[in-house]
Amino acid sequence: MKFVDEAVIKVQAGDGGNGVVSFWREKFVTNGGPDGGDGGDGGDVYMVADENLNTLIDYRFQRFYEAERGKNGGGGNCTGKSGKDKELRVPVGTRAVDIHTNEIIGEVAEHGKKVMIAKGGWHGLGNARFKSSVNRSPRQKTLGTKGELRDIRLELLLLADVGMLGMPNAGKSTFIRAVSAAKPKVADYPFTTLVPSLGVVSVLPEKSFVVADIPGLIEGAAEGAGLGIRFLKHLERCRVLLHMIDIMPADQSDPAHNALTIIDELEQYSEKLAKKPRWLVFNKVDLMSEEEADEIIQNIIDALAWEGDYFKISAANRQGTKELCMKLAEFMDTLPREAEEKTEAEKVDFTWDYNHKDGLAGREVITEDDDDWDDWDDEEDDGHVIYVRD
């Protein structure tokens, strides 16, 4: 199935049901009081994480999703039925972003998690709500409010422990093939990797971690050049980054300059991402003598002023890959997993109001005329008084 990590949709929460004007009428009761019920609340729209999904491709074909409208109220103080919620099932790791404000509405990072992305409208009030000591037969009601309408961008962020970055043809996909059961495409031309891929690395029966490979970065990626900038977001949840450096590039470019380019593009894209733990991995050491490889590696380290961890491997021959994976597994045990950033509902600016309170404090009140209804207070029929409670 095609990998789709972004989709734009429109969601419409259900409108609230209207209140109703009704009076109690039955045999021997000709002047019963008001018994108009409230409407039902509109349905909400939710995003629900499903571990059985791994792409957002379904949301490329259907772009509009709508929750159910609340039912209108009825006589006999009957409240209308609330509208049915709409649930959008998405892969684990998906977040919803408001297109117009770039506000992160919420994200689902574990199976079954549910986040509201559009709020349904509040119910309208029936005329029974307007009964007072001075207005015994109110003919007023309120309408249900509109459900929230939002344009939303769904973004899928892969959940991985280790993220790989580097220039095209640095050997990232070859490394994943060497250490896991994943089989990404490998070839001797740039941008062989067109979409991110995941591999599970098992170093011991009880120790494993997930590695994410994204398309290679090139100079100017932060301004949109190449493919990698589209997928850098998938590294945001990784706990450590592996910077793969080809010490003998096929295009005869300077490996030190290439390494500096990757670091510069990473810093331009996200300061937070650039501050993540990062290891240098020098690949293709089998293509030259050990002395030549050590000399090139030292030149790169000096150019980067690097003081962190680095490793020498040959992904094609699996030289040094086992030791690197063992070190990564040990590092995972010492590095606590980042706490999930929770988006609290109170901080999300939904556009609904608490209209069940506003109904008596300035919201539009509808007055219905009906000659069949008798007002036993003998009020003049030349107009209606609408009382607003403070």
Curated annotation (Swiss-Prot):
One GO term of the biological process aspect: ribosome biogenesis
Entry's Gene Ontology molecular function annotations: GTP binding; GTPase activity; magnesium ion binding
Subcellular location field: Cytoplasm
InterPro entries xref list: G_OBG, GTP-bd, GTP-bd_Obg/CgtA, GTP1-OBG_CS, GTP1_OBG_dom, GTP1_OBG_dom_sf, OBG_GTPase, P-loop_NTPase
Obg domain location: 1-159
Alphabetical UniProt keywords: Cytoplasm, GTP-binding, Hydrolase, Magnesium, Metal-binding, Nucleotide-binding
Primary localization class, coarse: cytoplasm
Residue span(s) of domain OBG-type G: 160-333
CDD domains assigned: Obg
GO cellular component: cytoplasm
Top-level EC class: hydrolase
Positions bound to Mg(2+): 173, 193
Sites where the protein binds GTP: 166-173, 191-195, 213-216, 283-286, 314-316
EC number(s) on file: 3.6.5.-
Consequence of gene loss (knockout): Essential for growth, it cannot be disrupted. One group found this gene can be disrupted in a relA deletion strain. Another group has found that it cannot be disrupted in a relA deletion strain, in agreement with data from E.coli (RelA phosphorylates GTP to ppGpp).
Cofactor dependency: Mg(2+)
Gene3D superfamilies: GTP1/OBG domain, P-loop containing nucleotide triphosphate hydrolases
Subunit field text: Monomer. Interacts with SpoT (AC Q9KNM2) in a yeast 2-hybrid assay.
Cited function: Depletion experiments lead to gene down regulation and a dramatic increase in ppGpp levels, like those seen in the stringent response. There is no change in cell morphology in depletion experiments, but cells are very sensitive to the DNA-damaging agent hydroxyurea and are very elongated. Overexpression reduces growth and leads to elongated cells. Overexpression of proteins with C-terminal deletions of 29 or 62 amino acids showed fewer elongated cells. An essential GTPase which binds GTP, GDP and possibly (p)ppGpp with moderate affinity, with high nucleotide exchange rates and a fairly low GTP hydrolysis rate. It may play a role in control of the cell cycle, stress response, ribosome biogenesis and in those bacteria that undergo differentiation, in morphogenesis control. GTPase activity is stimulated by 50S ribosomal subunits.
Similarity-based family: Belongs to the TRAFAC class OBG-HflX-like GTPase superfamily. OBG GTPase family.
Name listed for the protein in its UniProt record: GTPase Obg/CgtA
UniProt source species: Vibrio cholerae serotype O1 (strain ATCC 39315 / El Tor Inaba N16961)
